Amino acid sequence: MNVAVRLKAAAVWLCRIGHSRGFGIQSPTDYWMVRYVINEHWPYYQYETLGRHDDWLTRKMGRLCFRLANWLQPSVVESRDYRNYLQAGCRKTVFGESSELVVMPLENCSQDRLSYIYNKVSPRSVLVVTGISKVRRLWRQIVDDERTGITFDLYYCGIVMFDKKRHKRNYIVNF
């Protein structure tokens, strides 16, 4: 692995150390989400076989998608990437247009695409956007949009939830 990439990853992790493992999160539901879905460290049954030949970031993001699919158990997932991980997390999942779990890169995303997603989501929907560190302005727009609810900034990706019964919050998480 490239030494510069590893050093940058270590620097990002150190800058976010105060946001580790749910520290500072007062909501029990959000704390549970950070501890037992986002930052779960116990090895899952599929970890040995999944992503054996992937680079460290693809494997890290794939394992997050695996845990999200395992937690949500969606019937349909919309994603171009991480399909093996998502399928392993929920075997009954099929891929197509979905409002349950959407995984998409933010770099090539338009406002029209986001509006389309916002108009079809339910309170149980989860949107995972990758590459938020490259397009911070667009990520801030997603966080600030009144149609989104709880958001988690993981530096490499963002997780958006749409349950409007809960107070709108943005959490920075050391992932």
Predicted features and spans:
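A short alpha-helical cap/connector motif
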Residues: 1-125, 132-175
